[in-house]
Amino acid sequence: MLQLLLAVFIGGGTGSVARWMLSMRFNPLHQAIPLGTLAANLLGAFIIGMGFAWFSRMTNIDPVWKVLITTGFCGGLTTFSTFSAEVVFLLQEGRFGWAMLNVLVNLLGSFAMTALAFWIFSASTAN
């Protein structure tokens, strides 16, 4: 269990630093679209897709590596990667309605929670 915790810790830290570096490098290039964040999300989705595909075939891989790369690195780089993988799994299972609902709930829910947080913060600091 300690090895798994350390794997998440190391992978998460590394992914977070990678995301920060991408943001510092690419976000200033375009005012309306944070290109570094987009790159982190797309890269994380690609890595987790490759990771899950690879780990499903390489069943003898130590679980520490799986957790380091997927939960740790991709989780630190972006949580969008996990969401993307879950939608792809639903699509592969032929559960198209659930996949689309998952997309709507995750995206709209995330936007709504962000807006709610901004509203709560603004309301609490208005006076």
Curated annotation (Swiss-Prot):
UniProt main location, coarse: membrane
GO MF: fluoride channel activity; metal ion binding
InterPro entries membership: FluC (IPR003691)
Regulation: Na(+) is not transported, but it plays an essential structural role and its presence is essential for fluoride channel function.
Record-annotated membrane-spanning stretches: 4-24, 35-55, 71-91, 103-123
Binding-site residues for Na(+), renumbered to this chain: 75, 78
Places the protein is found: Cell inner membrane
A GO biological process held by the record: cellular detoxification of fluoride
Topology of the protein relative to the lipid bilayer: Multi-pass membrane protein
Disulphide bridges, residue numbers: none
GO CC annotations on file: plasma membrane
Keywords: Cell inner membrane, Cell membrane, Ion channel, Ion transport, Membrane, Metal-binding, Sodium, Transmembrane, Transmembrane helix, Transport
Reaction it catalyzes: fluoride(in) = fluoride(out)
Keyword Nucleotide-binding (UniProt): no
PANTHER family, per database record: FLUORIDE EXPORT PROTEIN 1-RELATED (PTHR28259:SF1)
Family: Belongs to the fluoride channel Fluc/FEX (TC 1.A.43) family.
Role summary: Fluoride-specific ion channel. Important for reducing fluoride concentration in the cell, thus reducing its toxicity.
NCBIfam families noted in UniProt: crcB (TIGR00494), PRK14196.1 (NF010792)
Designated name of the protein: Fluoride-specific ion channel FluC
Native organism: Escherichia fergusonii (strain ATCC 35469 / DSM 13698 / CCUG 18766 / IAM 14443 / JCM 21226 / LMG 7866 / NBRC 102419 / NCTC 12128 / CDC 0568-73)
Taxonomic lineage of the native organism: Bacteria, Pseudomonadati, Pseudomonadota, Gammaproteobacteria, Enterobacterales
